[in-house]
UniProtKB/Swiss-Prot annotation:
SUPFAM superfamilies: Lysozyme-like. Its EC number is 2.4.99.28. One of its GO terms (cellular component) is plasma membrane. PANTHER family: BIOSYNTHETIC PEPTIDOGLYCAN TRANSGLYCOSYLASE, MONOFUNCTIONAL BIOSYNTHETIC PEPTIDOGLYCAN TRANSGLYCOSYLASE. This is Biosynthetic peptidoglycan transglycosylase. Keywords: Cell inner membrane, Cell membrane, Cell shape, Cell wall biogenesis/degradation, Glycosyltransferase, Membrane, Peptidoglycan synthesis, Transferase, Transmembrane, Transmembrane helix. Its main location: membrane. It comes from Salmonella schwarzengrund (strain CVM19633).
Length: 242
């Protein structure tokens, strides 16, 4: 009787290990490939597309027009760093002090959860993982973050991030966002336009760059102040990010 009970558990354990090994090979290959090849789509794009099809929205197309860092305004890279991860050039994927502050805040305010994900973490999860919150997903995110930080340069991480970030419903990547909201290529975005796009990133399905709320406008102004404090465009050159 005991052997019959153990056998299924052994089978499930082996199956789980094989699945994890296959995912490790898949993700490892993706990290290596996308270190040099433009990213055609992300896990978030795929999830949005499948969700739209299941809802009968067959006209929805999740798509991103890849552009190199040379074709992105330096203001845009600076804006997302100022808004999301000011220690981006310094850390190895994780901002430990920010994580500690977020944990302390979340213990005091359970209804208003604060995140502390770096641009590297956001790139890893947007590119490779499903949406949601769980310890399993966090563990995978940490491993993938270490992977891209090890293989990719900071400039590459920022380039991929800007090309797969969601700026609105069905609007992925800074080139699509620049064309949709400002009718210009990403290379010509001004400081204020870049800050406005960065201002919607916490929740691009709620906050609108084409109809900014008072909160979005105040966040845009804060981001612009942070951009100036970081040193403006020279910050990007100094840290070899453009």
């Amino acid at each position: 009787m005991s052997k019959r009970r153990i056998a299924p558990l052994t089978f499930l354990r082996r199956l789980l290990l094989r699945i994890l090994a296959a995912l490790a090979v898949f993700w490892g290959g993706g990290i290596a490939l996308f270190s040099v090849v433009p990213v055609p789509f992300s896990a978030v794009m795929a999830e949005r597309q499948i969700s739209a099809w299941l809802s009968g929205e067959f006209g929805y197309v999740a798509h991103s027009d890849w552009v190199s860092m040379a074709d992105i305004s330096p203001w845009m890279g600076l804006a997302v760093i100022a808004a999301e991860d000011q220690k981006f050039p310094e850390h190895w994927g994780f901002d430990v002090p920010a994580i500690e502050k977020a944990l302390a805040h979340n213990e005091r305010n359970e209804s208003r959860i604060r995140g502390a994900s770096t641009l590297s973490q956001q790139t890893a999860k947007n590119l490779f993982l499903w949406d949601g919150r769980s310890w399993v997903r966090k563990g995978l995110e940490a491993g993938l973050t270490l992977g891209i930080e090890t293989v990719w340069s900071k400039k590459r991480i920022l380039t991929v991030y800007l090309n797969i970030a969601e700026f609105g419903d069905g609007i992925f990547g800074v080139e699509a966002a620049a064309q949709r909201y400002f009718h210009k290529p990403a290379s010509r975005l001004s400081m204020s336009e870049a800050a406005l796009l960065a201002a919607v990133l916490p929740n691009p399905l709620r906050y609108k760059a084409n109809a900014p709320s008072g909160y979005v406008r105040s966040r845009q102004a804060w981001i612009m102040r942070q951009m100036r404090q970081l040193g403006g465009e020279s910050f990007m050159t100094r840290n070899q990010l453009n």
